């Protein structure tokens, strides 16, 4: 079983063609810059969306190595921060499994009380 980051956005209007193009260019840039892009998943936005969403997606995290896991979490939270800022008119939700990320000072952060315990529980799932 894996652990994933889930992300979604809602707003009252659909994305314009210009917004879609700009957003997709940023997604491609972020995916290409991910240091483990050949070994792990990158940003994956779903083509079929749930009602009311303008974006939905997920990225499976690499669980084999704790250092790579932590680096990946940091990278994807920063990447999602950039995407959130690029579509600031949308309401975003970011979770790692059932743990919500918090939007603090223009960036997504995880605020676990006991990060090592959380990592250990993810390792058990692998």
Predicted regions and their residues:
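N-terminal low-complexity, intrinsically disordered segments
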Residues: 21, 33-44
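Charged interaction segments
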Residues: 30, 41-126
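Short, extreme N-terminal segment that most often corresponds to the first beta-strand
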Residues: 1-27
């Amino acid at each position: 079983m894996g652990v994933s980051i889930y992300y979604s956005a809602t707003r009252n209007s659909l994305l314009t063609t210009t917004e879609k193009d700009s957003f997709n260019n940023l997604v491609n840039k972020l995916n290409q810059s991910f240091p483990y892009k050949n070994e792990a998943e990158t940003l994956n936005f779903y083509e079929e969306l749930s009602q009311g969403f303008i974006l939905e997606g997920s990225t499976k995290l690499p669980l084999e190595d704790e250092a790579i896991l932590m680096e990946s979490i940091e990278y994807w939270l920063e990447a999602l921060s950039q995407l959130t800022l690029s579509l600031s008119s949308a309401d975003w939700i970011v979770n790692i499994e059932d743990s919500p990320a918090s939007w603090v000072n223009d960036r997504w952060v995880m605020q676990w009380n006991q990060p090592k315990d959380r990592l250990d529980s993810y390792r058990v799932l692998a």
